Amino acid sequence: MSRWIATFIAVACTLLGISAPLRADPVAETHVRKANLSRAVEDGRLRQMIGQMVLVGFVGDSPDDDGYKRVVKQAEAGEITGVIYLGRNISSLEAVRQLNKGLQQYATAPLLVAIDQEGGRIQRLTGEVGFKEVPSEATVAKTMSPEEASVVYQDLASDLSSLGFNLNLAPVVDLNVNPSNPIIGKLGRSFSADPQKVEAYARAFIEAHRAKGVLTALKHFPGHGSSTKDSHKGIADVTKTWSDKELLPFKDLIASGDVDIVMAAHVINAKLAFSPDIPASLSRATLTVLLRDNMHFKGVVISDDMQMQAITDNVSFEDSVLRAVMAGNDILIFANDKHPDPEIPEKVAAILSEEARRNPEMLDRIKTSYENVMHLKRKLGSAVSQETTVVRER
Protein backbone atom coordinates (compact mmCIF):
# COMPACT_ATOMS: atom_id res chain seq x y z
CA MET A 1 0.00 0.00 0.00
CA SER A 2 1.44 3.38 -1.00
CA ARG A 3 2.30 6.06 1.54
CA TRP A 4 -0.26 8.33 -0.14
CA ILE A 5 -3.21 5.99 0.36
CA ALA A 6 -1.99 5.10 3.85
CA THR A 7 -2.08 8.78 4.75
CA PHE A 8 -5.63 9.00 3.43
CA ILE A 9 -6.73 6.06 5.56
CA ALA A 10 -5.20 7.58 8.68
CA VAL A 11 -6.90 10.92 8.07
CA ALA A 12 -10.22 9.30 7.19
CA CYS A 13 -10.25 7.13 10.29
CA THR A 14 -9.58 10.17 12.44
CA LEU A 15 -12.26 12.29 10.81
CA LEU A 16 -14.89 9.59 10.71
CA GLY A 17 -14.28 8.76 14.33
CA ILE A 18 -15.26 12.23 15.51
CA SER A 19 -18.88 12.27 16.60
CA ALA A 20 -19.30 15.99 15.94
CA PRO A 21 -17.05 18.61 14.30
CA LEU A 22 -14.92 20.59 16.73
CA ARG A 23 -16.13 24.17 17.01
CA ALA A 24 -15.05 27.16 19.06
CA ASP A 25 -18.66 27.93 19.99
CA PRO A 26 -21.11 25.22 18.87
CA VAL A 27 -24.12 26.93 20.48
CA ALA A 28 -23.52 30.18 18.64
CA GLU A 29 -22.95 28.36 15.36
CA THR A 30 -26.20 26.44 15.78
CA HIS A 31 -28.09 29.72 16.18
CA VAL A 32 -26.47 31.09 13.03
CA ARG A 33 -27.37 27.97 11.07
CA LYS A 34 -30.97 28.10 12.22
CA ALA A 35 -31.19 31.76 11.23
CA ASN A 36 -29.76 30.98 7.80
CA LEU A 37 -32.21 28.12 7.36
CA SER A 38 -35.13 30.34 8.35
CA ARG A 39 -34.13 32.95 5.80
CA ALA A 40 -33.62 30.34 3.09
CA VAL A 41 -37.06 28.83 3.69
CA GLU A 42 -38.77 32.19 3.95
CA ASP A 43 -37.49 33.56 0.67
CA GLY A 44 -37.91 30.30 -1.23
CA ARG A 45 -34.21 29.87 -1.88
CA LEU A 46 -34.04 26.40 -0.37
CA ARG A 47 -36.23 24.97 -3.14
CA GLN A 48 -34.19 26.78 -5.77
CA MET A 49 -30.94 25.49 -4.30
CA ILE A 50 -32.19 21.91 -4.30
CA GLY A 51 -33.31 22.27 -7.89
CA GLN A 52 -29.72 22.91 -8.93
CA MET A 53 -28.82 19.46 -7.59
CA VAL A 54 -31.16 17.40 -9.79
CA LEU A 55 -30.40 16.35 -13.37
CA VAL A 56 -33.05 14.24 -15.10
CA GLY A 57 -33.77 12.27 -18.21
CA PHE A 58 -37.08 12.63 -20.02
CA VAL A 59 -39.26 10.68 -22.42
CA GLY A 60 -39.85 12.20 -25.83
CA ASP A 61 -38.10 13.49 -28.93
CA SER A 62 -40.29 16.43 -29.95
CA PRO A 63 -41.66 19.62 -28.36
CA ASP A 64 -45.14 18.11 -28.40
CA ASP A 65 -44.26 15.16 -26.16
CA ASP A 66 -45.54 15.29 -22.59
CA GLY A 67 -42.16 14.31 -21.16
CA TYR A 68 -40.46 17.23 -22.86
CA LYS A 69 -43.18 19.66 -21.82
CA ARG A 70 -42.74 18.51 -18.24
CA VAL A 71 -38.99 19.16 -18.11
CA VAL A 72 -39.50 22.54 -19.75
CA LYS A 73 -41.87 23.46 -16.91
CA GLN A 74 -39.43 22.11 -14.35
CA ALA A 75 -36.62 24.14 -15.92
CA GLU A 76 -38.79 27.25 -15.93
CA ALA A 77 -39.60 26.72 -12.25
CA GLY A 78 -35.95 26.15 -11.34
CA GLU A 79 -36.68 22.58 -10.22
CA ILE A 80 -33.86 20.96 -12.21
CA THR A 81 -30.26 21.82 -12.96
CA GLY A 82 -30.32 20.12 -16.33
CA VAL A 83 -31.27 17.16 -18.48
CA ILE A 84 -29.53 14.08 -19.82
CA TYR A 85 -30.23 12.71 -23.29
CA LEU A 86 -30.64 9.04 -24.10
CA GLY A 87 -31.08 7.48 -27.52
CA ARG A 88 -34.88 7.71 -27.20
CA ASN A 89 -34.65 11.52 -27.29
CA ILE A 90 -32.89 11.70 -30.65
CA SER A 91 -34.93 11.57 -33.85
CA SER A 92 -32.79 13.96 -35.90
CA LEU A 93 -30.03 16.48 -35.35
CA GLU A 94 -32.30 19.42 -36.07
CA ALA A 95 -34.93 18.10 -33.66
CA VAL A 96 -32.31 17.85 -30.91
CA ARG A 97 -31.11 21.38 -31.63
CA GLN A 98 -34.65 22.73 -31.31
CA LEU A 99 -35.33 20.79 -28.11
CA ASN A 100 -32.22 22.21 -26.49
CA LYS A 101 -33.00 25.71 -27.69
CA GLY A 102 -36.44 25.48 -26.10
CA LEU A 103 -35.07 24.19 -22.82
CA GLN A 104 -32.59 27.02 -22.43
CA GLN A 105 -35.14 29.60 -23.57
CA TYR A 106 -37.47 28.90 -20.66
CA ALA A 107 -34.95 28.00 -17.94
CA THR A 108 -34.59 30.38 -15.00
CA ALA A 109 -30.88 29.53 -14.82
CA PRO A 110 -28.64 28.10 -17.56
CA LEU A 111 -29.26 24.37 -17.86
CA LEU A 112 -26.67 21.65 -18.04
CA VAL A 113 -27.58 19.73 -21.19
CA ALA A 114 -25.74 16.44 -20.86
CA ILE A 115 -25.07 13.40 -22.98
CA ASP A 116 -22.85 10.31 -22.86
CA GLN A 117 -20.74 10.65 -26.00
CA GLU A 118 -17.60 8.73 -25.13
CA GLY A 119 -17.10 7.13 -28.53
CA GLY A 120 -17.32 3.54 -29.73
CA ARG A 121 -20.13 1.60 -28.11
CA ILE A 122 -21.14 4.48 -25.83
CA GLN A 123 -22.52 7.33 -27.89
CA ARG A 124 -26.13 8.45 -27.99
CA LEU A 125 -25.71 10.50 -31.15
CA THR A 126 -24.94 8.11 -33.98
CA GLY A 127 -24.35 7.97 -37.69
CA GLU A 128 -27.96 6.91 -38.16
CA VAL A 129 -29.05 10.51 -37.60
CA GLY A 130 -26.07 12.01 -39.43
CA PHE A 131 -23.77 12.55 -36.47
CA LYS A 132 -20.07 11.94 -37.01
CA GLU A 133 -19.18 9.15 -34.59
CA VAL A 134 -15.79 8.82 -32.93
CA PRO A 135 -13.86 5.64 -32.09
CA SER A 136 -13.83 4.09 -28.64
CA GLU A 137 -11.25 5.22 -26.12
CA ALA A 138 -9.40 1.93 -26.56
CA THR A 139 -9.23 2.39 -30.34
CA VAL A 140 -8.19 6.04 -30.04
CA ALA A 141 -5.28 5.15 -27.75
CA LYS A 142 -4.16 2.30 -30.01
CA THR A 143 -4.31 4.20 -33.30
CA MET A 144 -3.61 7.85 -32.47
CA SER A 145 -1.23 10.04 -30.53
CA PRO A 146 -2.76 12.33 -27.89
CA GLU A 147 -2.24 15.22 -30.33
CA GLU A 148 -4.15 13.40 -33.07
CA ALA A 149 -6.86 12.46 -30.58
CA SER A 150 -7.21 16.12 -29.65
CA VAL A 151 -8.24 16.95 -33.22
CA VAL A 152 -10.87 14.21 -33.20
CA TYR A 153 -12.20 15.35 -29.84
CA GLN A 154 -12.31 19.01 -30.86
CA ASP A 155 -14.51 18.05 -33.80
CA LEU A 156 -16.72 16.04 -31.45
CA ALA A 157 -17.02 18.90 -28.97
CA SER A 158 -17.78 21.38 -31.73
CA ASP A 159 -20.56 19.15 -33.02
CA LEU A 160 -22.02 18.74 -29.54
CA SER A 161 -21.90 22.47 -28.89
CA SER A 162 -23.65 23.26 -32.17
CA LEU A 163 -26.55 21.05 -31.06
CA GLY A 164 -26.85 22.80 -27.70
CA PHE A 165 -25.02 20.30 -25.49
CA ASN A 166 -22.72 21.80 -22.88
CA LEU A 167 -21.79 18.70 -20.87
CA ASN A 168 -20.30 15.48 -22.17
CA LEU A 169 -20.32 12.86 -19.41
CA ALA A 170 -16.86 11.62 -20.32
CA PRO A 171 -13.98 10.76 -20.46
CA VAL A 172 -13.72 7.41 -18.75
CA VAL A 173 -10.43 7.38 -16.83
CA ASP A 174 -10.85 3.90 -15.39
CA LEU A 175 -7.76 1.76 -15.94
CA ASN A 176 -8.21 -1.27 -18.17
CA VAL A 177 -6.82 -3.61 -15.52
CA ASN A 178 -9.48 -6.22 -16.25
CA PRO A 179 -10.00 -6.57 -20.02
CA SER A 180 -12.91 -8.94 -19.27
CA ASN A 181 -14.75 -6.28 -17.27
CA PRO A 182 -18.28 -6.41 -18.74
CA ILE A 183 -18.94 -2.67 -18.51
CA ILE A 184 -15.48 -1.16 -19.12
CA GLY A 185 -12.83 -3.41 -20.68
CA LYS A 186 -15.08 -5.48 -22.93
CA LEU A 187 -16.71 -2.34 -24.32
CA GLY A 188 -13.43 -0.61 -25.12
CA ARG A 189 -14.23 2.23 -22.72
CA SER A 190 -10.73 2.59 -21.25
CA PHE A 191 -7.74 4.23 -22.90
CA SER A 192 -5.24 1.89 -21.26
CA ALA A 193 -4.10 0.03 -18.16
CA ASP A 194 -1.26 2.56 -17.88
CA PRO A 195 -2.24 5.53 -15.66
CA GLN A 196 0.05 7.96 -17.50
CA LYS A 197 -1.38 6.99 -20.87
CA VAL A 198 -4.93 7.35 -19.57
CA GLU A 199 -4.07 10.77 -18.20
CA ALA A 200 -2.56 11.95 -21.50
CA TYR A 201 -5.56 10.98 -23.61
CA ALA A 202 -8.06 12.17 -21.02
CA ARG A 203 -6.32 15.54 -20.95
CA ALA A 204 -6.62 15.76 -24.73
CA PHE A 205 -10.34 14.99 -24.42
CA ILE A 206 -10.92 17.56 -21.68
CA GLU A 207 -8.94 20.37 -23.30
CA ALA A 208 -10.59 19.79 -26.67
CA HIS A 209 -14.05 20.07 -25.13
CA ARG A 210 -13.11 23.08 -23.03
CA ALA A 211 -11.93 24.90 -26.15
CA LYS A 212 -15.44 24.51 -27.56
CA GLY A 213 -17.28 25.48 -24.39
CA VAL A 214 -18.32 21.94 -23.41
CA LEU A 215 -17.83 20.67 -19.87
CA THR A 216 -16.58 17.16 -19.15
CA ALA A 217 -16.78 14.68 -16.27
CA LEU A 218 -14.11 12.22 -15.19
CA LYS A 219 -15.58 8.82 -14.43
CA HIS A 220 -15.98 6.51 -12.56
CA PHE A 221 -14.41 7.58 -9.24
CA PRO A 222 -12.60 5.93 -7.48
CA GLY A 223 -12.17 3.38 -10.26
CA HIS A 224 -14.42 0.84 -12.01
CA GLY A 225 -11.82 -0.76 -14.25
CA SER A 226 -11.11 -3.81 -12.11
CA SER A 227 -14.72 -4.86 -11.59
CA THR A 228 -16.06 -8.21 -12.73
CA LYS A 229 -19.69 -7.09 -12.68
CA ASP A 230 -21.82 -4.29 -14.12
CA SER A 231 -23.17 -1.81 -11.56
CA HIS A 232 -26.10 -1.09 -13.88
CA LYS A 233 -27.34 -4.57 -13.04
CA GLY A 234 -26.44 -4.87 -9.36
CA ILE A 235 -23.62 -4.78 -6.85
CA ALA A 236 -20.10 -4.49 -8.25
CA ASP A 237 -17.56 -5.00 -5.46
CA VAL A 238 -13.99 -4.02 -6.34
CA THR A 239 -12.54 -4.29 -2.84
CA LYS A 240 -10.31 -7.26 -3.70
CA THR A 241 -9.43 -6.20 -7.25
CA TRP A 242 -8.91 -2.43 -6.90
CA SER A 243 -5.50 -0.85 -6.33
CA ASP A 244 -4.58 2.73 -5.52
CA LYS A 245 -2.94 3.23 -8.91
CA GLU A 246 -6.50 3.55 -10.23
CA LEU A 247 -6.65 6.91 -8.47
CA LEU A 248 -3.66 8.31 -10.36
CA PRO A 249 -5.46 9.68 -13.45
CA PHE A 250 -8.00 11.40 -11.20
CA LYS A 251 -5.32 12.68 -8.84
CA ASP A 252 -3.00 14.07 -11.52
CA LEU A 253 -5.72 15.68 -13.63
CA ILE A 254 -7.28 17.29 -10.55
CA ALA A 255 -3.88 18.58 -9.42
CA SER A 256 -3.39 20.31 -12.78
CA GLY A 257 -6.74 22.10 -12.49
CA ASP A 258 -8.21 20.48 -15.59
CA VAL A 259 -11.26 18.84 -14.02
CA ASP A 260 -14.74 20.38 -14.03
CA ILE A 261 -16.71 17.41 -12.71
CA VAL A 262 -16.00 14.02 -11.18
CA MET A 263 -18.61 11.27 -11.45
CA ALA A 264 -19.00 8.97 -8.45
CA ALA A 265 -19.25 5.26 -9.17
CA HIS A 266 -21.76 2.88 -7.63
CA VAL A 267 -19.01 0.33 -6.94
CA ILE A 268 -18.33 -0.98 -3.46
CA ASN A 269 -14.76 -0.45 -2.34
CA ALA A 270 -14.35 -1.28 1.33
CA LYS A 271 -10.70 -0.20 1.20
CA LEU A 272 -11.92 3.37 0.87
CA ALA A 273 -15.45 3.40 2.28
CA PHE A 274 -14.47 1.40 5.39
CA SER A 275 -17.64 -0.64 4.94
CA PRO A 276 -18.44 -3.80 2.98
CA ASP A 277 -21.82 -2.53 1.80
CA ILE A 278 -21.56 1.20 1.03
CA PRO A 279 -21.11 2.17 -2.64
CA ALA A 280 -18.54 4.86 -3.34
CA SER A 281 -21.35 7.17 -4.47
CA LEU A 282 -22.88 7.04 -0.99
CA SER A 283 -19.61 7.11 0.94
CA ARG A 284 -18.48 10.24 2.77
CA ALA A 285 -15.06 8.67 3.29
CA THR A 286 -14.67 8.31 -0.47
CA LEU A 287 -16.21 11.54 -1.78
CA THR A 288 -15.51 14.02 1.00
CA VAL A 289 -12.46 12.74 2.87
CA LEU A 290 -10.60 11.26 -0.09
CA LEU A 291 -11.75 13.30 -3.09
CA ARG A 292 -12.32 16.68 -1.43
CA ASP A 293 -10.01 16.77 1.57
CA ASN A 294 -7.13 14.58 0.42
CA MET A 295 -7.12 15.12 -3.36
CA HIS A 296 -8.23 18.77 -3.03
CA PHE A 297 -10.95 18.60 -5.68
CA LYS A 298 -12.86 21.89 -5.77
CA GLY A 299 -15.27 21.22 -8.62
CA VAL A 300 -18.64 19.48 -8.88
CA VAL A 301 -19.23 15.88 -7.83
CA ILE A 302 -22.00 14.20 -9.80
CA SER A 303 -23.46 10.78 -9.13
CA ASP A 304 -23.78 8.06 -11.69
CA ASP A 305 -27.42 7.34 -12.49
CA MET A 306 -29.20 6.91 -9.17
CA GLN A 307 -31.64 4.49 -10.81
CA MET A 308 -29.00 1.88 -11.56
CA GLN A 309 -29.66 -1.44 -9.85
CA ALA A 310 -26.57 -1.21 -7.66
CA ILE A 311 -28.56 1.48 -5.84
CA THR A 312 -32.23 0.64 -6.37
CA ASP A 313 -31.85 -3.03 -5.41
CA ASN A 314 -30.19 -2.20 -2.11
CA VAL A 315 -31.27 1.23 -0.85
CA SER A 316 -34.66 2.93 -0.68
CA PHE A 317 -35.21 6.00 -2.82
CA GLU A 318 -35.33 8.32 0.19
CA ASP A 319 -32.22 6.87 1.81
CA SER A 320 -30.28 6.93 -1.44
CA VAL A 321 -31.02 10.64 -1.92
CA LEU A 322 -30.12 11.55 1.66
CA ARG A 323 -26.97 9.45 1.73
CA ALA A 324 -25.78 10.61 -1.68
CA VAL A 325 -26.01 14.27 -0.71
CA MET A 326 -24.44 13.79 2.71
CA ALA A 327 -21.63 11.77 1.11
CA GLY A 328 -20.69 14.78 -1.00
CA ASN A 329 -22.52 14.60 -4.33
CA ASP A 330 -23.47 18.02 -5.67
CA ILE A 331 -25.71 16.75 -8.49
CA LEU A 332 -27.78 13.58 -8.61
CA ILE A 333 -28.53 12.02 -11.99
CA PHE A 334 -31.87 10.32 -12.57
CA ALA A 335 -31.78 9.15 -16.18
CA ASN A 336 -35.39 7.90 -16.08
CA ASP A 337 -34.44 5.03 -18.35
CA LYS A 338 -36.26 1.81 -17.46
CA HIS A 339 -38.90 3.25 -15.14
CA PRO A 340 -39.38 6.93 -15.98
CA ASP A 341 -40.75 9.07 -13.17
CA PRO A 342 -41.44 12.72 -14.08
CA GLU A 343 -42.04 13.48 -10.39
CA ILE A 344 -38.39 12.91 -9.42
CA PRO A 345 -37.52 16.61 -8.90
CA GLU A 346 -40.51 17.12 -6.62
CA LYS A 347 -39.74 13.97 -4.65
CA VAL A 348 -36.08 14.87 -4.19
CA ALA A 349 -37.01 18.39 -3.12
CA ALA A 350 -39.48 17.10 -0.53
CA ILE A 351 -36.92 14.70 0.94
CA LEU A 352 -34.08 17.20 1.13
CA SER A 353 -36.24 20.11 2.32
CA GLU A 354 -37.64 18.09 5.20
CA GLU A 355 -34.19 16.89 6.23
CA ALA A 356 -32.70 20.39 5.97
CA ARG A 357 -35.37 21.76 8.28
CA ARG A 358 -34.23 19.48 11.07
CA ASN A 359 -30.59 18.92 10.22
CA PRO A 360 -28.28 21.96 9.88
CA GLU A 361 -25.59 19.76 8.36
CA MET A 362 -27.90 18.90 5.47
CA LEU A 363 -28.63 22.58 4.94
CA ASP A 364 -24.90 23.24 4.80
CA ARG A 365 -24.47 20.48 2.23
CA ILE A 366 -27.27 21.86 0.05
CA LYS A 367 -25.81 25.36 0.20
CA THR A 368 -22.33 24.09 -0.64
CA SER A 369 -23.62 22.05 -3.57
CA TYR A 370 -25.60 25.01 -4.85
CA GLU A 371 -22.50 27.20 -4.71
CA ASN A 372 -20.41 24.56 -6.49
CA VAL A 373 -22.96 24.11 -9.26
CA MET A 374 -23.50 27.82 -9.81
CA HIS A 375 -19.74 28.39 -9.93
CA LEU A 376 -19.55 25.70 -12.60
CA LYS A 377 -22.33 27.34 -14.59
CA ARG A 378 -20.68 30.74 -14.37
CA LYS A 379 -17.51 29.18 -15.71
CA LEU A 380 -19.51 27.59 -18.50
CA GLY A 381 -21.07 30.91 -19.39
CA SER A 382 -17.70 32.58 -19.73
CA ALA A 383 -16.27 29.76 -21.82
CA VAL A 384 -19.09 28.98 -24.23
CA SER A 385 -17.90 29.12 -27.78
CA GLN A 386 -19.68 31.51 -30.11
CA GLU A 387 -19.26 29.16 -33.03
CA THR A 388 -22.25 28.61 -35.28
CA THR A 389 -20.73 25.69 -37.13
CA VAL A 390 -23.32 23.30 -38.48
CA VAL A 391 -22.77 19.68 -37.51
CA ARG A 392 -20.91 17.92 -40.26
CA GLU A 393 -23.02 15.31 -41.93
CA ARG A 394 -21.76 11.77 -42.17
Task: Describe every region a protein language model picked out.
Residues 144-165, 246, 323-324:
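Alpha-helical scaffold segments that flank or form the walls of functional sites
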Residues 50-58, 78-85, 185-187:
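Acidic/histidine-rich, surface-exposed loop or edge segments in extracytoplasmic proteins
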Residues 44-58, 118-137, 180-182, 217-235, ...:
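N-terminal small/glycine-rich loop or linker at the start of catalytic domains
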Residues 131-144, 188-192:
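A charged helix-plus-loop insertion that forms the helical arch/lid used to bind
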Residues 104-132, 152-176, 198-222:
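Glycine-rich, aromatic-flanked loop segments that form ligand/cofactor-binding clefts
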Residues 72-86, 162-167:
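Catalytic domains of carbohydrate-active enzymes, especially glycoside hydrolases
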Residues 2-5, 13-73, 284, 293-294, ...:
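Preference for extracellular/luminal or secreted protein segments
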